[in-house]
Amino acid sequence: MNVNVPVPSTLADPLVIAGRTFSSRLFLGTAGYPNQKVFLDALEASGSEMATASIRRMSLEGYEESLADLLTGRVHILPNTAGCQTAKDAILTAELAREALETDWVKLEVIGDRELLYPNVEELLKATEELVNRGFVVLPYCNDDPVTCQKLADLGAATVMPLGSMIGTGLGIANPHMIELICARSPVPVVLDAGIGTASDAAQAMELGCAAVLLNTAVSKAHDPVRMARAFRYAVEGGRLARLAGRIPKKLHAEASSPEFGLVGS
C-alpha cells in the first residue's frame, strides 16, 4: 500500500477544521501549569490558536481568573470530556460545555480504563454519532487504529485524534507506521493527541502526515514550560515544512552526492 499523503506545493496551507481556519498547527492543553503567568506565557510562546480544557476544571484551576475568562479572546476554546467513561456521560458533559461556553466544538474523550486512560472505542463511536446528530463539531480522541479512525470519520467527526502513546507518558509515537497509515487513509484532518514527550516527537508526527499536534504535559511539566512551548512551535513548523518538501527515499546502499567526473585516477 502506498502511504504517501498528498501535500500542497506551498506553505500557504492553513489548517481548516469544520470551516474554521487555523494558521498554527499546534493545539495546547491547559492543565498542570505552575501558575497563571507561566500558562499564559507558554500559550503565547506556542503560537497556538486553540486550547483545550476539561469542562469540570474551567473554574477550578486555581488561577486568579477562570480558564474561560483567561482564554476568551486569546484562542479558540475547545472543551473536552476528560474523565467520562460512558457515551451518556460524555454527551451530558458536551451539552454542559455548549451551554456554558456557547460553543458546538468538543474534544470527545471516552475512557475505557482509568489507569491506562485508553479510549473505549464502542462508547466513543456511540457518543460521536449522537453528538454529530445534535450539531456538535466532534474531535474524538481515539486509539491508533485505522479502522476506528475511518468509522469515526464516517460518523461525521471533524477530525480524528489518535494517540501517539498513552496520555502523560511522554513515550512519543509508539507506532509510527500506524499513524502514517491513518494519515494516508483519513478523509478528515489527523491530529496526534497524547504521549508526546519532546519537540522531536511533534516534528515526527508532522513528517508522518499529521495535520496538527495536540499536547499538554510535555509543556506544562517541562522544567521551563515557556521555552518548551516555543520549541514545540518550531518543531511543528519544521515538521510541516519537511512534509511539504518531501524527504529523500530510504536506500540500502550508499550513493555519493558528488559526481565521479574529474576524480584523480579516473
From Swiss-Prot:
Localization (cell): Cytoplasm
Highest taxon of the lineage: Bacteria
Gene Ontology cellular component terms for the protein in this record: cytoplasm
Catalysis: reaction(s): [ThiS sulfur-carrier protein]-C-terminal-Gly-aminoethanethioate + 2-iminoacetate + 1-deoxy-D-xylulose 5-phosphate = [ThiS sulfur-carrier protein]-C-terminal Gly-Gly + 2-[(2R,5Z)-2-carboxy-4-methylthiazol-5(2H)-ylidene]ethyl phosphate + 2 H2O + H(+)
Coiled-coil annotated residue ranges, if any: none
InterPro entries: Aldolase_TIM, Thiazole_synthase_ThiG, ThiG
Residues that, per the record, bind 1-deoxy-D-xylulose 5-phosphate: G168, A194, G195, N216, T217
Keyword Transport: no
A molecular function GO annotation: thiazole synthase activity
Keyword Cytoplasm: yes
EC number: 2.8.1.10
Pathway the protein contributes to: Cofactor biosynthesis; thiamine diphosphate biosynthesis
Active site, per annotation: K107
GO biological process, one term: thiamine diphosphate biosynthetic process
Keywords: Cytoplasm, Schiff base, Thiamine biosynthesis, Transferase
Family: Belongs to the ThiG family.
Subunit annotation: Homotetramer. Forms heterodimers with either ThiH or ThiS.
Function of the molecule: Catalyzes the rearrangement of 1-deoxy-D-xylulose 5-phosphate (DXP) to produce the thiazole phosphate moiety of thiamine. Sulfur is provided by the thiocarboxylate moiety of the carrier protein ThiS. In vitro, sulfur can be provided by H(2)S.
Protein name: Thiazole synthase
Source organism (scientific name): Azorhizobium caulinodans (strain ATCC 43989 / DSM 5975 / JCM 20966 / LMG 6465 / NBRC 14845 / NCIMB 13405 / ORS 571)
Source lineage: Bacteria, Pseudomonadati, Pseudomonadota, Alphaproteobacteria, Hyphomicrobiales
Encoding gene per record: thiG
